């Protein structure tokens, strides 16, 4: 049984592979932490800031561009995973349904998944699909950490107010969910999210 005691070197992240179907996923071994969120919530930007590698995860002004599960290797055993964005109205329903089925299969069956980071724009938190994803993850007993991104777009007081409102809304889940403020622009919350990821990676298999 392999144990991961030290924090991974996020700056060592390298693109590994992409999967459009469940059977295209890399071997289910080691440890993975996945990122998911609405299109344009800042998911790719968060991955780029966390790793310190500009352009690692492709960002786009066009929501819905990430249509596959993208894997980034930190080392031989540990990976960050960029799940398809959801909630973009211009994506055909058939395509959207395929994404949902792929993500659901990943969350349900991926044994090496250590935790799920749910990325939400702080100005539009807890949309219906966000709540659906949280329900999926809770049902599959996956730890969840919520990033309220783009916190620099609000005043400090407004950001703290929204943080409190979301905390109240998810309080029924207890310790299964944690959350924080985050900004890729001014790096608010960067050390905090890295600490959460490192704790998950160090957890027992």
Swiss-Prot record:
InterPro entries cross-referenced by the UniProt entry: G_ENGB_dom, GTP-bd, GTP-bd_ribosome_bio_YsxC, P-loop_NTPase
Presence of keyword Cell cycle: yes
Keywords: Cell cycle, Cell division, GTP-binding, Magnesium, Metal-binding, Nucleotide-binding, Septation
GO cellular component, one term: cytosol
An individual GO BP term: division septum assembly
Molecular function via GO: GTP binding; metal ion binding
Pfam families per record: MMR_HSR1
Residues given in the record as Mg(2+) binding sites: 44, 66
Kinase as UniProt keyword: no
Residue ranges of every copy of the EngB-type G domain listed in the record: 29-203
Co-factor requirement: Mg(2+)
Record function comment: Necessary for normal cell division and for the maintenance of normal septation.
Protein name, as recorded: Probable GTP-binding protein EngB
Record organism: Coxiella burnetii (strain RSA 493 / Nine Mile phase I)
């Amino acid at each position: 049984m392999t144990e991961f005691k030290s924090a991974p070197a996020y700056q060592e992240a390298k693109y590994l592979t992409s999967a459009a179907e469940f059977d295209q996923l890399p071997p289910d071994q080691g440890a993975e932490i996945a990122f998911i969120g609405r299109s344009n919530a800042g998911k790719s930007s968060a991955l780029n800031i966390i790793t310190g590698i500009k352009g690692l995860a492709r960002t786009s002004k066009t929501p819905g561009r990430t249509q596959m599960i993208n894997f980034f290797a930190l080392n031989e055993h540990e990976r960050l995973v960029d799940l398809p964005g959801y909630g973009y109205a211009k994506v055909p329903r058939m395509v959207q349904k395929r994404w949902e089925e792929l993500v659901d299969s990943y969350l349900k069956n991926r044994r090496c998944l250590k935790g799920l980071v749910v990325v939400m724009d702080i100005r539009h938190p807890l949309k219906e699909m966000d709540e659906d994803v949280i329900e999926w993850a809770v049902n599959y007993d996956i730890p969840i950490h919520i990033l309220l991104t783009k916190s620099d777009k609000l005043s400090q007081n407004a950001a703290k107010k929204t943080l409190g409102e979301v905390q109240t809304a998810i309080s029924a889940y207890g310790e299964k969910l944690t959350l924080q403020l985050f900004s890729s622009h001014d790096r608010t919350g960067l050390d905090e999210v890295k600490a959460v990821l490192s704790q998950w990676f160090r957890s027992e298999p």
